[in-house]
């Protein structure tokens, strides 16, 4: 077999290119493999309160502020009611004003681990699809609460009154910020219809 002049150098060059390409592929594979691990590390804290009394949490809560999301888009005067049934299950009634009328969504809540994780509930509004309901803060008198979920894109501030006490509101906003949530993204909910209804009832 005869080699033309420069063939050996061409082969060496090809081998070098092949090795370089393999190194790039290996590096890319390692980076890709590391992405899920990076995604799992979160920069927000959605841990639940360690002391929580469900019986004191029951009743009506007004939605003061929330992150924007599809299932409440364009809705105001929103509120939630939590009702304990005789069988121990919790019924969830969510109401809100949209398209010129109040709309009602009825759901249910489970209490998976009241002993070790008392501030964690699971709420469903459709069949057997449940979402995490994390009570991340509630004041000692159960007048205001900060609620999150598994993902950072969900955040709610709930109050027993349509207009919360300013000091309590500042407290819950500080807590949200400490946990890594961007409070500038909060949508402040118009509660004028609920306020009017309360005033009319007095």
Model-derived regions, located:
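Short, Lys/Arg-enriched N-terminal segments with co-localized hydrophobic residues
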Residues: 8-21
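A beta-rich soluble binding module of mature secreted/lumenal proteins
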Residues: 40-202
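Sec-dependent N-terminal signal peptides
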Residues: 25-34
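Hydrophobic alpha-helical segments with strong N-terminal bias
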Residues: 23-26, 43-44
